[in-house]
């Protein structure tokens, strides 16, 4: 699939499989444009992707919303011994700190766990 084909698929709300790099994590991510996410997309990712369901946002939106990286949140905690702090402050095998943040839920969700709740949160984040 060419880059143009992948972009067209994303614009239609279809999944694109994205391989990050054999020199990094060497994994394939299922990617779909947030504005099109449905509960069916979430179910498919949950059942077939085998990992976290993540929403990528740009850093300026994250800062505006006060969404700090989990690494920064944990590293500022005084409740870790030196072994735990070493694990938190360490780098991933690909050379960076993990860039995950905290879990978020839209205010109209119930638990945030269901496919419907997750899809709603992701779609609404696309509107920001």
What are the roles of these predicted feature ranges?
Residues 1-128:
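Catalytic domains of riboflavin
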């Amino acid at each position: 699939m060419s880059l143009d084909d992948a972009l067209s698929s994303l614009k239609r709300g279809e999944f694109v499989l994205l391989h990050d790099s054999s020199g990094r994590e060497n994994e394939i991510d299922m990617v779909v444009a947030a504005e099109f996410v449905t509960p069916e997309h979430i179910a498919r990712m949950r059942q077939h992707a085998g990992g976290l369901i993540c929403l990528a946002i740009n850093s300026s939106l994250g800062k505006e919303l006060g969404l700090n990286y989990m690494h920064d949140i944990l590293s500022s905690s005084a409740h870790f011994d030196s072994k735990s702090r070493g694990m938190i402050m360490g780098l991933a095998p690909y050379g960076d700190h993990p860039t995950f943040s905290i879990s978020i839920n839209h205010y109209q969700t119930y638990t945030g766990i269901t496919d419907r709740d997750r899809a709603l949160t992701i779609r609404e984040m696309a509107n920001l």
